[in-house]
Amino acid sequence: MPGSSLSASPAADWTTEDAWIGTRRPILEAHALPADAYASEAFFALERDRVFGTSWVCIGIADELDPVGQVLVRDLGGRSVLITTNTSGELRGFANSCRHRGTQLLDADCTIGRTLRCPYHRWGYDRDGTLVATPQFIDAGIDRFDPTDYGLHPIRVEQWGCLLFANLDHDAPSVDEWFGDLGNRLAGYRLEGWHSHLSHSIDIRANWKLVSENFQEYYHLRWIHPELAKVSRVEDHFRYQGNGMYCGQTTTPLSGDERGDWDVLRPAEGLDAADTASGRFVALFPNVLLSLLPNHAFVMRLEPIGPGLTREHCTWLLPPGSEDVLDEDFAVTRDFWLEINSEDIGIVQRGQVGLDSGGYTPGRLSPRFEEPLHRFHNMLADRMTGIARIPDGDLADDLPLLGTGINPLPWRSHLSAH
């Protein structure tokens, strides 16, 4: 059966290069991932440790911490962590485990005062993680006990734009290094000032990678999203990638003449001509899908729950100056994305059913439409095999083939020429 030799067996050691032969080939020869990558409990467990336990994982939007004393409870590579700010407003992150006997401190987001209390024996910690209260503990006559030795175990937390990221790997590069040149590419949007306008979460019966891959490729656009294709035409899609842990595409120009959903809201101030006329669609590895338009953004944060279950946290962002947007104006944009997302959810859930069926061997990828998937798969392979590598940008010789660059070859012209 074509491609079957490239499908890793259920007993494959995913920490070795032998399991990734089809992925490591050039895009013109590469295969998609085998079904085990989406359906195997063993793969999922390894992935949580090697991908989500070592990467800069998005854990929310910065303004989720706006209330003083707000604490976010998040899963990071299967480990529960707490995210907050100290009294100076600086980001802090900790393991969600009391240093006394390991009790979980919080089970849901909440707002605390100056002290975070363990529900078991009331040990208390300030928002820097320092142990500040041990009721009746020292009075019991314990020897050589120094509270400064028993603060909460810290984790790294950084802000990128208006997004919050956490990392369990204390040796990982900074989040700015992780995303490479993407910060400069998006600098004109001034994302650090954008704010949440609406959020909701939904469970999707599909592997998190299926959700991400569906976002990254536009091969399906005409058939799954006929309405989206009116404002984001297939022939106007081009690669939007460089040095950094991200995969992306851009729609240039946006075609608002057929459907005006994206024209209702005011655009951000200070955008250059290219950003004003374009949509940027970027998958930030591993778990953020960012649709960035001149006047709003739709962000999907993926939380893997199991091999075939993903919790998708959706947030609509607006730029500074949009605080007074009318509900009826925003509703048009909201409903547009709900429609698109519903179409995507339906097809990725169908994809999961097919992968679970046991009848799939890896297919080939389209260089023009699916190269971001090849890049994504290789990022995944790097993390799974223990390679700490940040990918480079596109090679100059690849630009026409992959539909990228400042002045990409017209889509139809390229296909007709070959």
Short names for language-model regions:
Residues 64-170, 176-184:
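Rieske [2Fe-2S] iron-sulfur-binding domain
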Residues 3, 85, 90, 158, ...:
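C-terminal catalytic domain of Rieske-type non-heme iron oxygenases
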Residues 12-41, 107-120, 151-159, 229-266:
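N-terminal short leaders/motifs
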Residues 23, 29, 101, 127, ...:
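Glycine-rich, flexible loop/turn motifs
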Residues 1-109, 155-158:
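N-terminal pre-ligand scaffold of iron-sulfur
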Residues 54-66, 136-140, 281-286:
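Short Pro/Gly-enriched beta-strand edge/turn motifs at strand-loop
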